[in-house]
């Protein structure tokens, strides 16, 4: 999903950076407030960031100028909400661009928009919707992570199609081509990420029940927080 350094036209790179900036600024405020009011959450924040960094560094070759990999953003979005995940995702993408040559600085805005903004919001939206319908927690976690991953690649396909429309069929033709190529690797990766996120969440339920209760992850059917609901 990481679009390579220098691959996007300058105007596109700037536009995606401008579009991403307000979300990241808002996320910094949310993260600062979270750490100030709940300093005990720093360990879980670090774990969420590390989960994203490790998973998104496992890249497979895909469309020219990009690659396929898990994103790892669904977990952090479920735990701390999408604004904070925008910051954790941006830090992840920046370090990967500088240390791993994965992505790039000129394409940072585009990569942030797809992986650190749209992915977490889409995944969190599905997670919250399923929770409202009283779907078991681990099922909602799976679909939240699955959608966060898959929606990231949908946005990347849009970004590439906007930058490089097909000479004959234009934007829609390019979108279909980019999306279909990504789908070959990304759908299995999204399923795998969903299952892995469920495993991690089960471990967190066993080790950090109090923190998950405070964050609102452990809820009863009536909306009250409770720990035993996760056993389903």
Swiss-Prot record:
Keywords: Cell membrane, Cobalamin biosynthesis, Cobalt, Cobalt transport, Ion transport, Membrane, Transmembrane, Transmembrane helix, Transport
Protein name: Cobalt transport protein CbiM
PANTHER family assigned: COBALT TRANSPORT PROTEIN CBIM, PTHR43627
Any one of the GO CC terms: ATP-binding cassette (ABC) transporter complex
Record's subcellular location: Cell membrane
Any one GO BP annotation for this protein: cobalamin biosynthetic process
Reported function: Part of the energy-coupling factor (ECF) transporter complex CbiMNOQ involved in cobalt import.
Pfam families with a match to the protein in the record: CbiM
Family, per entry: Belongs to the CbiM family.
Gene Ontology molecular functions: cobalt ion transmembrane transporter activity
Transmembrane segments: 6-26, 43-63, 84-104, 107-127, 135-155, 181-201
InterPro entries, per database record: CbiM, CbiM/NikMN
Lipid bilayer topology: Multi-pass membrane protein
Keyword Membrane: yes
Oligomeric and partner information: Forms an energy-coupling factor (ECF) transporter complex composed of an ATP-binding protein (A component, CbiO), a transmembrane protein (T component, CbiQ) and 2 possible substrate-capture proteins (S components, CbiM and CbiN) of unknown stoichimetry.
Gene3D superfamilies to which the protein is assigned, alphabetical: 1.10.1760.20
Pathway membership: Cofactor biosynthesis; adenosylcobalamin biosynthesis
């Amino acid at each position: 999903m990481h679009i390579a350094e220098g691959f996007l036209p300058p105007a596109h790179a700037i536009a995606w950076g401008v579009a991403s900036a307000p979300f990241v600024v808002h996320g910094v405020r949310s993260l600062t407030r979270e750490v100030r009011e709940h300093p005990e959450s720093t360990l879980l924040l670090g774990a969420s960031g590390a989960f994203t960094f490790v998973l998104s560094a496992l890249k497979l070759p895909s469309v020219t100028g990009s690659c396929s990999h898990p994103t790892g953003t669904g977990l952090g979005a479920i735990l701390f909400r999408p604004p904070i995940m925008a910051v954790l995702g941006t830090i992840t993408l920046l370090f990967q661009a500088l240390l791993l040559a994965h992505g790039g600085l000129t394409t940072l805005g585009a990569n942030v928009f797809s992986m650190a903004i749209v992915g977490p919001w889409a995944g969190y939206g599905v997670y919250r919707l399923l929770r409202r319908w009283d779907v078991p927690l681990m099922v909602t976690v799976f679909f939240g992570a699955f959608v966060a991953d898959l929606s990231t690649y949908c946005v990347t396909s849009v970004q590439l199609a906007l930058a490089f429309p097909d000479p004959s069929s234009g934007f829609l033709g390019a979108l279909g081509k980019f999306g279909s190529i990504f789908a070959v690797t990304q759908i299995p990766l999204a399923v795998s990420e969903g299952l892995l996120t469920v495993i991690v969440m089960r471990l967190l339920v066993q080790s950090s029940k109090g923190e998950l209760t405070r964050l609102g992850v452990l809820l009863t059917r009536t909306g009250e927080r409770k720990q035993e609901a996760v056993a389903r």
